[in-house]
Amino acid sequence: MANLSRLFSVKIGRQTTAAQYGVFGVGIILAPGAAFFGLKYSTYESAKIENFNDLYRVYTSADDAASDGMSGDNLLAVQAYFSQSPSPDTLVVGDFSAAYSKTMIKLTGVPVVGAPSGTKATIGYVKGGEYRYAKFNGTAWSGSAGATADIVADSGAEGQFLVDGRIVYLEGAEVVHKSSTALSSAVSSAVAAIKNQYNKFFMSMTTSRDLSIQKAIADWTESQIDKMAVFIDDYSSPTWATDSITKYIHDKNMAGSFAVSTRREKNFLDAALAGRCLVMQPGSETWALKTLNAAQADDFTETDYQKIQALNGNTFEDYGSGITVTYPGTCGDGESIEVVRFCYWQADRMQKDLATLFVNRNKIGHDMPGYEVVCNKMESSLKAGQTAGGIIENFTDENGDLIRGFEVVRPTMAEVGATQRIKGDLTVKFKFYLRYAIKHVDAIGSAMTYGI
């Protein structure tokens, strides 16, 4: 039977595959005892172990985190993140309980919603492969088998208890991070487990000020090609000058981590600064001179500041005249935070643009026209970085020569060997000039008398 295709055959192949760009604007709070599973007094006794497989939650507001059951320092950090202006869209919270072998909790006096007045606190936790629960009547804990042995009163502080297990529900009490038992050797695997479940985050922070945990997070972060971390540096520590997170990342010349120093407890400058700056396009921002909401400024002396600055640390201070800002915005190695973030973004952009180009072409020839296609795509990626503000615009120097913000060097046929052609390998060199931010101005002038 005759068919129109005999005369006019039309076939359309869809070449619409696009590599997904990385995430460079979302923070993650690594929260031991996150307890974000939404349990309530009416449901916590009937929960099943399989309810707690997830190690993360994604939030668009602090209220959602509170509704899920987050409390104490973990919730304060979430609130600091979302309190910035403009407010960030997304925050990931990772259940970082594996970083503690035992978790300290403290009674808050806040009533357990829906419970009889005699119930002062309730808890649900996972130990091994078993879910356990208990409630506190003001004198003793009671609940599922083994619970009374797992929850031990702290002899050094009334109303505090050490819990042997991963806390997944908690009311009437909050986690006391500084009194919990840190397990720094488990940090890398704990973060990796969260990442394996959900990798759409860029900047890590933690509610724990335990130095061993902070160091382990910094070490893990430095090994990643698309992650950064920000830490609260406890300047009140008597060992700050010799052993602090600021000194650690400085001495190890870390580019992927930075710290903000404070003397104040429950002052989550890390979350506030991340929430303030991650909303901005990489390359368009500086992390210095930023005002922060839901955060307290420190009153450092000039000597204090010079000590912190010498280790490439950062502060949030009141400079008078209504100016309370962060400064100087540097990573452990002394590089500007925004420069490191931009370079990660630019590398990801170019890689994904090249991937998208090649998977949507039947063939790109290993010859001059093919090289031009590749170089044009790389220039397009660099132009995007220039438009974003991370690469300087073209300018004319003092000699009248045009200086380009970026350059892609075209390989010649003679430069490409036969072995490269046979294997399909190609090396293309490029360079660009970073567009740094002005953070300090010295204005020097003269006052003169006319006529002299």
Model segments located where?
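Surface-exposed assembly/interface segments
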Residues: 1-452
